[in-house]
Amino acid sequence: LMAVYLYALPQDDALLTAVGGVTPLVTFHRGDCTVAPENTLPAFRSAILKGGDRIELDVQMTSDGVVVVTHDSNLKRCTGKNAKVYDLTYAEVAQLDAGRWFSSRFADTRIPTLEQVLQLCRGRIGLNVEIKPSAATPALEAETVRLLREYGFDSSNCVITSQSYETLHKVKALAPEYPTGYILALGVGNYYDLPDADFFSVETTFITSGMVKA
């Protein structure tokens, strides 16, 4: 499985040769965040309209158990609120403006719930769901899987990724049908033998021929 994180990709013979004949999946990282605030419904709508194969998004859980789509554990960068996601209720998160930092045109854009995103994307685009776990939210993996199943996202249109191998282990125990990807800063050791990682997401400058062959 190969995912290419970019906004436009020419489908020519030279490209296909470079990637070993595998057709890349065009994945919009945090949605189309060049034109709209990252991890918001406007960014996801733009990715759909531009014909992407998948959207990569990040999920966390509020203090009252709602799975929301946002990248940083601290909400200050995108909302101005200096607080952790897991310390706030969903009602508190839903009051935050997640768009004004990007442009005044997106003022009052909210942090979406995973359920809202699934309602938007179902039947229109696939997903790469990155789970961002916390010791404060042990139910995050199970609730994420429950929602994906409820809205018809399966191994044909969804992968689950994480920087936490423990999270991937939990996902495989809950839902072995989902392809799981381990996000690595560096490829060190026999990581490719890890049983609960079906593929790896590695920064391009660290990829070697030996890594690909392994």
Locations of regions flagged by a protein language model:
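Phosphate-group recognition and catalysis centered on beta-loop-alpha active-site segments
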Residues: 1-214
